[in-house]
């Protein structure tokens, strides 16, 4: 096991510990069932950690692709808005919609067939070389097996580099962990600024005697209410 893999596992259990402390509601029946199943299958937690790390990285990679597509769509929309039609644009305009759709569909089907053929050969070819390798070396195969179904399995396989998927996991999760640590540090600093300073709680009570609290009381001008009332009455 590499040091990076050790850090990822410890970070995952640290986050689970925080959830355990913050979330008090749990289904007792489900909890007992899970504990019994883990006792019967002690190695299941090993594969669950692999699956969680792979799925977490896959979600982050998909979010990045979604953001890229949104940016491309916004750029295309802005270009279409800024593009001014000419006098003969409508007359010379063609409608290649049906052709492009059929062309795109054929390309998509070819790419899908190629990816499926590549993905079906990956587990058998890499099983012998990754049997005694690191923790995350065969995590992608574990996650695809847990996902169930060819569609979800191919989706996970297509998101990662098939030769070194663990490097992508290191990059994605380490970046998110660093940002979470920074946010947690900022929240701690902000929370400390709102707290009451209790450093002076051990200060002797003599400093808070009546003489000190009312030392300036005699120096202030004292007006007799009776004199004011008499003057106003006259």
From Swiss-Prot:
Residues 199-234 are annotated as: Disordered. InterPro entries: DUF2076. Pfam families: DUF2076. This is Uncharacterized protein BUsg_175. It comes from Buchnera aphidicola subsp. Schizaphis graminum (strain Sg).
